[in-house]
Amino acid sequence: DNYFLVYKDEFCYNKSYSNGYPMGTIKRLNSFDKAVVTTLYICFKLKNNVSINIDYFEQYCESGIFNKELVKIANEGGRAHGLLNVTPTDFFNMHMRIPCIAEQNSIATILVKACKEIELAKEKLANLQSQKRGLMQQLLTGKRRIVEQ
């Protein structure tokens, strides 16, 4: 009873402050088919009859633009155990300005591609760091020697 079942492509607003997210964060479930979250979250899905690109909305949420609206509805000094005092009613009454669907699609395509490139770069960095650790172990313990030419 104290949990919500969230399905793929639905969103959750975490009202907790975390590093880089002073007004909490809105995240899309896209790595799993479903998940369970505490009722402290505000969960929602985009309406079918609204012209909004889900990837655009995800990037919009990630950008922090919503913080300007969240500041208006979060009660001053209304933190309880690190949670912002944001009601679902106030949350769903927030306004957002969005461009036409064609522009949303273009923006989403560019930003999703950029995110994929960043992920590939992170993977490459992790692989290089792993290789370096392996080389350090071999070189610094004498398991591998450098031959002067």
Language model: regions and residue ranges:
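A short glycine-rich beta-alpha junction/loop motif
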Residues: 34-40, 75-102
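Short amphipathic alpha-helical coupling segments at ligand-binding clamshell hinges
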Residues: 53-60, 106-110
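Ligand-binding loop in jelly-roll beta-barrel domains
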Residues: 46-53
